Amino acid sequence: MLASYLNLFNTPWNSSISIIMILSNIMAIVVGRYSIKVRGLKPPIAISQLKDFGVPELLATMSLGHIIGVGSTIGLKTLNFITY
């Protein structure tokens, strides 16, 4: 109810939001790469730079990155740092 009042979920997609989402996902992958203790389980990813980093780890870090990105977008929109 508060979100509809503040009109937070009607923000059109623009380049600033995409940059926030990309940076949030990259940050989550980097943090997950060094903080996940049990990694490298099946199935692997076919990228040589991400050795011992499988599909479960990628899905977990990308999910965290999306949560961080959406929270950042809503917070920055509330503080009027993101404009149309």
From Swiss-Prot:
Q: Does the keyword DNA-binding apply?
A: no
Q: What is its main location?
A: plastid
Q: What Gene3D superfamilies does UniProt report for this protein, alphabetically?
A: Photosystem I PsaK, reaction centre
The family database entries (InterPro entries) matched by this protein are listed as: PSI_centre_PsaK_sf (IPR035982), PSI_PsaG/PsaK (IPR000549), PSI_PsaK (IPR017492), PSI_PsaK_bact (IPR037101)
> What cellular-component terms does GO give this entry?
chloroplast thylakoid membrane; photosystem I
Q: Known SUPFAM superfamilies for this protein?
A: Photosystem I reaction center subunit X, PsaK
Alphabetized, the UniProt keywords read: Chloroplast, Membrane, Photosynthesis, Photosystem I, Plastid, Thylakoid, Transmembrane, Transmembrane helix
Entry membrane topology = Multi-pass membrane protein
Q: Which domain of life is it from?
A: Eukaryota
| Any one biological process term the GO annotation gives | photosynthesis
Instruction: Report TM segments.
Output: 12-32, 54-74
Q: Which Pfam families match?
A: PSI_PSAK (PF01241)
Q: Where in the cell is it found?
A: Plastid, Chloroplast thylakoid membrane
Q: What family is it from?
A: Belongs to the PsaG/PsaK family.
Cite the NCBIfam families for this sequence: PS_I_psaK (TIGR03049)
Q: Can you name this protein? A: Photosystem I reaction center subunit PsaK
The primary gene name is: psaK
